[in-house]
């Protein structure tokens, strides 16, 4: 994947909106485009990165050496048993140290919750993480495979994504050798 040159349209302009204390939803249609975009995000920051890899796609690329793993990244591969402890430790980390926190992906996160209403837990966790990252001026990214239906972002399962205020929303689309980033 790294060997193919990809250009990013609007990356620097949109990256300037990804400021400290911000939560950024990254909507995508293609998981490979998402991985390329998140690699670009990771290489553009020098501060520590905590990466929750719920879908294990990025971990697979690192393990196969298709993508070079940055030295400032901690990959977390949660499971149902360790998720709550990992979230607790992450809350402490992002409260004390400026960090890039990446939740990849919202779709995978939902699948970890054994509950009639997983949205309540997932949304509460995102709000709690978002509130705590402000102590250290951290930045959070949440990737999400979704599409806009009837003016609302919707997961492939039909579940609506809760719209929070003060969250940046970006959509990435790839064609040929270019990934376009657009604030939506």
Language model features by range: what are they?
Residues 19-90:
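Conserved P-loop
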């Amino acid at each position: 994947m790294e060997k193919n040159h990809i250009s990013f349209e609007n990356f620097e302009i949109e990256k300037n909106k990804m400021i400290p204390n911000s939560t950024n939803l990254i909507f995508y249609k293609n998981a490979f485009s998402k991985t390329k975009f998140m690699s670009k995000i990771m290489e553009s920051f020098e501060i520590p990165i905590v990466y929750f890899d719920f879908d294990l796609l990025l971990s697979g690329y690192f393990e196969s050496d298709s993508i070079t793993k940055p030295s400032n990244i901690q990959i977390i591969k949660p499971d149902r048993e360790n998720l709550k402890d990992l979230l607790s430790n992450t809350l402490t980390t992002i409260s004390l140290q400026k960090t890039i926190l990446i939740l990849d992906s919202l779709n995978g996160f939902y699948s970890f919750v054994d509950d009639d209403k997983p949205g309540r837990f997932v949304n509460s966790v995102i709000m709690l993480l978002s509130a705590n990252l402000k102590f250290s001026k951290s930045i959070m990214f949440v990737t999400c495979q979704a599409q806009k239906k009837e003016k609302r972002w919707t997961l492939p399962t039909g579940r609506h994504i809760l719209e929070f205020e003060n969250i940046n929303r970006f959509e990435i689309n790839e064609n040929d050798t270019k990934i376009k980033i657009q604030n939506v």
